[in-house]
């Protein structure tokens, strides 16, 4: 046990976590030179293309230290995006230590702080690493100072390294061996193992990534899952180094995989404790808090006969992504589909992209919304995540919207722009601190404003330097209304929005004029209206295309022409009564692009 070290790598987006993981794997001989490629642990195509990590991945390595002993290192690479912060906390709870990677040219950023606090809360030893010191713009002294000022941990012994060139990677491993404590645990006690992650493999069923806390786990053991009380027979165990290798057993303190022929991911819940049937553990390990979706959107197949295949795709995707939630819903405009819950906008984009790529789905997505709490006249509280389901105004006492606490780090030069943006988004400033070149802003903001396009705007008004981290705070009463779009006086439920009353007029006008550009011309006039309740706030018309029925009358009597025009008029009137307007996919996306 003394020779085991479990550690994760935590950092802000693009500070070089995955590159550092590559270097460490290479140095420990986990892969030969031929198999080495950039971002070894990022296994999905999307992760590679976007250059981000989505799923935490592990590697078990052996390292011969300078003191001549051989240590077993279990490395877990974690994501940096705020949407995937729960992956970070899961990885950290399986470790005794963490490498806090900070880009020496950028300094401390929002996720650095958030992830580091998560680590400190879980009582994990944090080893600061200053990466990218080969860059001409690197300023290690300043970065050191920022770590001490902002986070408050001692950075005097921070390791200087460059993951790109491989400089200082050995020093990092020496620091891991020297400063991170070995795992505590008793190999002779009854088995207790924590499920850190689980995913579906087409050949063997569900693969569980576990951290063994006490006892040993070996094939042919009868396993008991403590939360679901399911029983399974263990088929094989092993480790990822980073390729999977079978082992005879996993002992206390080790991180590895367990396969037990489960076909349902529900049985292997992340955060559950595994024990054996013959020697049961008395109490389960503290798991993780269930992650709640923050953003909801409707996903509909373009062809209505694709509904079943979309359902199967979502089921398969959920096997790999425990935080995705979905339930069937029906829309008058779009037919049958699903209401899906996501952790944030990036998560939503990635799920959509994976459905389109890996499962060949053609999708229509509705605008993302957050969950509102509605207090009814009779005192009951309901949660509404779909604008079309908002009850009638006469039955509601008040609507409460979710408020978040946003922590923003921004260089001083862009401070004004960021404050202006936060005020436009109905933000309330709570705190502001200067740390060297950086300013730390704390704002309370409505989640609905952050969901739409806040992140993109924050990046563009600070030339990409500002960084954001947010946490849910509470529900607060808000003056919000439901904005409906009517096309030929028919409500289109998929275009409904819940907006703040102050923005409603403007959003209504913008949306109506956007729709006018996107809806193709018909043989009759199409009226597009934006309404709050029964009050119409804006109207646009799509002019009819007109066939020239008088083309064949050269000269001749006026009554002849009148007869033809009347006939055309009657035809158009009849057409307008029965005709329905096709709404193109772009129109649904237009809702997303209306600026506040």
Swiss-Prot record:
GO terms under cellular component: plasma membrane
GO biological process, one term: positive regulation of translation
Keywords: Cell inner membrane, Cell membrane, GTP-binding, Hydrolase, Membrane, Nucleotide-binding, Protein biosynthesis
Entry keyword annotation includes Hydrolase: yes
Binding site for GTP: 14-19, 131-134
GO molecular function: GTP binding; GTPase activity; guanosine tetraphosphate binding; ribosome binding; translation elongation factor activity
Pfam families: EFG_C, GTP_EFTU, GTP_EFTU_D2, LepA_C
Catalytic activity: GTP + H2O = GDP + phosphate + H(+)
Signal peptide: none
Record domain tr-type G: where: 2-184
Enzyme Commission no: 3.6.5.n1
Subcellular location per the Swiss-Prot or TrEMBL entry: Cell inner membrane
HAMAP family registered for this protein in UniProt: LepA
Name assigned to this protein: Elongation factor 4
Gene name of the encoded protein: lepA
């Amino acid at each position: 046990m003394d020779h085991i070290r479990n550690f994760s790598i935590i950092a802000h987006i693009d500070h070089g976590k995955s590159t550092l993981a590559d270097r460490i794997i290479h140095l420990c001989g986990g892969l030969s030179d031929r198999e080495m490629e950039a971002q070894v642990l990022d296994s999905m195509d999307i992760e590679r293309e976007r250059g981000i990590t989505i799923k935490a991945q592990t590697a078990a390595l052996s390292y011969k230290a300078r003191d001549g002993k051989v240590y077993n290192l279990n490395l877990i690479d974690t994501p940096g995006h705020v949407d995937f912060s729960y992956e970070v906390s899961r990885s950290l709870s399986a470790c005794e230590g963490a490498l806090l990677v900070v880009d020496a040219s950028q300094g401390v950023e929002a996720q650095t702080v958030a992830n580091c606090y998560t680590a400190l809360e879980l009582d994990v030893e944090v080893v600061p690493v200053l990466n990218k010191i080969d860059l001409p713009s690197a300023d290690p002294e300043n970065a050191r100072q920022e770590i001490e000022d902002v986070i408050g941990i001692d950075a005097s012994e921070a390791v200087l390294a460059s993951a790109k060139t491989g400089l200082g990677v050995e020093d990092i491993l020496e620091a891991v061996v020297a400063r991170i404590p070995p795992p505590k645990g008793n190999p002779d006690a009854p088995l207790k193992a924590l499920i850190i992650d689980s995913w579906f493999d087409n050949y063997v069923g569900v693969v569980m990534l576990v951290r063994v806390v006490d006892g040993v786990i070996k094939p042919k053991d009868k396993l008991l899952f403590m939360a679901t009380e399911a029983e399974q027979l263990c088929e094989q165990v092993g480790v990822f180094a980073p390729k999977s290798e079978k082992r005879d057993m996993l002992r206390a303190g080790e991180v590895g995989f367990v396969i037990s022929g489960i076909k349902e991911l529900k049985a292997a819940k992340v955060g559950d404790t595994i024990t054996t049937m013959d020697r049961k553990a008395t109490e389960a390990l503290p798991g993780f808090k269930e992650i709640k979706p923050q953003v909801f959107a409707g996903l509909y197949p373009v062809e209505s006969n694709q509904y079943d295949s979309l359902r199967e795709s979502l089921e398969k995707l959920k096997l790999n992504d425990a935080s995705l939630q979905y339930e069937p819903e029906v829309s008058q405009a779009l037919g049958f589909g699903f209401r899906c819950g996501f952790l944030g906008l990036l998560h939503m984009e990635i799920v959509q992209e994976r459905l389109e790529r890996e499962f060949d789905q053609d999708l229509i997505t509705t605008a993302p919304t957050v969950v509102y709490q509605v207090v009814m006249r009779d005192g009951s509280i309901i949660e509404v995540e779909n604008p079309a389901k908002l009850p009638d105004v006469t039955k509601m006492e008040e609507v409460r919207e979710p408020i978040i606490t946003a922590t923003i780090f921004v260089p001083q030069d862009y401070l004004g722009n960021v404050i202006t943006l936060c005020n436009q988004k109905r933000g309330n400033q709570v705190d502001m601190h200067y740390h060297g070149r950086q300013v730390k802003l704390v704002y309370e903001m409505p989640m609905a404003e952050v969901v739409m396009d806040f992140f993109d705007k924050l990046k563009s008004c600070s030339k990409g330097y500002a960084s954001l981290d947010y946490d849910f705070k509470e529900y607060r009463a808000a003056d919000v209304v439901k904005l409906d779009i009517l096309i030929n006086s028919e409500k289109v439920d998929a275009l409904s929005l819940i907006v703040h009353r102050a923005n409603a007029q403007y959003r209504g006008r913008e949306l109506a004029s956007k729709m006018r550009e996107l809806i193709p011309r018909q043989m009759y006039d199409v009226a597009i209206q934006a309404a709050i309740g029964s009050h119409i706030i804006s109207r646009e018309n799509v002019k009819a295309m007109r066939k020239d029925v008088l083309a064949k009358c050269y000269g001749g009597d006026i009554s002849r022409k009148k007869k033809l025009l009347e006939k055309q008029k009657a035809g158009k009137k009849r057409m307008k009564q029965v005709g329905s307007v096709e709404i193109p996919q772009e129109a649904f996306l237009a809702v997303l692009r209306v600026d506040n």
